[in-house]
C-alpha cells in the first residue's frame, strides 16, 4: 500500500476511535441510545448532535474516497461526468442551493431534508454493496467503504430520528422520500453502461453526503450553540 493510502486509512481509523470513545463515554455503545423510545431519551441533545456530526463527516469522507477510487480505476477518459450531472435520484428534493440558502432555511425543514436524504439512500446502498461484491476485480478499497457507508447511514438515520423527536416533541416526520430505480443499470451486461451507472451513483452519494454534512453542522451551530460558532 502506498504512503497516501496508509495515511488515509490511518485517518479513518483515528476518526473511528474518536467516535467509539465518545459513544463509550456516553454509554451508548453496549446499550440502546434510547431504550424506551425517543420520547424518553436519556442522552442529551448536544451529545446526539456531536455523534451525528461526526458520523456524517465520516460518511462524506468515505464517499469521497470511494468515488475517487472508482474514478481512478474505471472512469478515466470515459466522459461519465457529463452523464452524471443532474441525474441523481434525490434531485426532486427541494434542497438549498448553497450554504447561504441553508442558513436561511427553517431548522424543521432542514431536518426533514436530512431524513429524506438518508432514507432515500437505504436501498441503493444495500444494492451497491451487493453489486460491488459481484464485480470482477473490484478493489477492497471500494467494497470496504461501501459496507461502512451502508452501516453508518443506518446509524445516522437512527440518530436523526432521535434528534427530530427531541427538537420537535410530538411531531411525526412522514414526508415522502425519493425512490431509487437504478438497479437494472448496475446489472446490465454492457460494461461501459454498468460502470457509468456506478459512477453516477457514487457521484450522487458524494454530493448528498456533503449536503447532509453541511445541514447537520448548521443545525448543530443554530440549535446547540445559538449560532455562536
From Swiss-Prot:
GO biological process, one term: positive regulation of endocytosis
Entry superkingdom: Eukaryota
Gene Ontology MF: a single term: hormone activity
Signal peptide from the UniProt entry: 1-30
One Pfam family this sequence matches: Hormone_1
PROSITE patterns noted in UniProt: SOMATOTROPIN_1, SOMATOTROPIN_2
Keywords: Disulfide bond, Hormone, Lactation, Phosphoprotein, Secreted, Signal
GO cellular component, one term: endoplasmic reticulum lumen
Subcellular location: Secreted
Keyword Phosphoprotein tagged: yes
Family (UniProt): Belongs to the somatotropin/prolactin family.
Assembly description: Interacts with PRLR.
Protein name in the entry: Prolactin
Organism: Bos taurus
Gene of this entry: PRL
Amino acid at each position: 500500500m502506498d504512503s497516501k493510502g496508509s495515511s488515509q486509512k490511518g485517518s479513518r481509523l483515528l476518526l473511528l476511535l474518536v467516535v467509539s470513545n465518545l459513544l463509550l463515554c456516553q454509554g451508548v455503545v453496549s446499550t440502546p441510545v434510547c431504550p424506551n423510545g425517543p420520547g424518553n431519551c436519556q442522552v442529551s441533545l448536544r451529545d446526539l448532535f456531536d455523534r451525528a456530526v461526526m458520523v456524517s463527516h465520516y460518511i462524506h469522507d468515505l464517499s469521497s474516497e470511494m468515488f475517487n477510487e472508482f474514478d481512478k480505476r474505471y472512469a478515466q477518459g470515459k466522459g461519465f461526468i457529463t452523464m452524471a450531472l443532474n441525474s441523481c435520484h434525490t434531485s426532486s428534493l427541494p434542497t438549498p442551493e448553497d450554504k447561504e440558502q441553508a442558513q436561511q432555511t427553517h431548522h424543521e425543514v432542514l431536518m426533514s431534508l436530512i431524513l429524506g436524504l438518508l432514507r432515500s439512500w437505504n436501498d441503493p446502498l444495500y444494492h451497491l454493496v451487493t453489486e460491488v461484491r459481484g464485480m470482477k476485480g473490484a478493489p477492497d478499497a471500494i467494497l470496504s467503504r461501501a459496507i461502512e457507508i451502508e452501516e453508518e447511514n443506518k446509524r445516522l438515520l437512527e440518530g436523526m430520528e432521535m434528534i427530530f423527536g427531541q427538537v420537535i416533541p410530538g411531531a411525526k416526520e412522514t414526508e415522502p422520500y425519493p425512490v431509487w430505480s437504478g438497479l437494472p443499470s448496475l446489472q446490465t451486461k454492457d460494461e461501459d453502461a454498468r460502470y457509468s451507472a456506478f459512477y453516477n451513483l457514487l457521484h450522487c452519494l458524494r454530493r448528498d453526503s456533503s449536503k447532509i454534512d453541511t445541514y447537520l453542522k448548521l443545525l448543530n451551530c443554530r440549535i446547540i450553540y445559538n449560532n455562536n460558532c
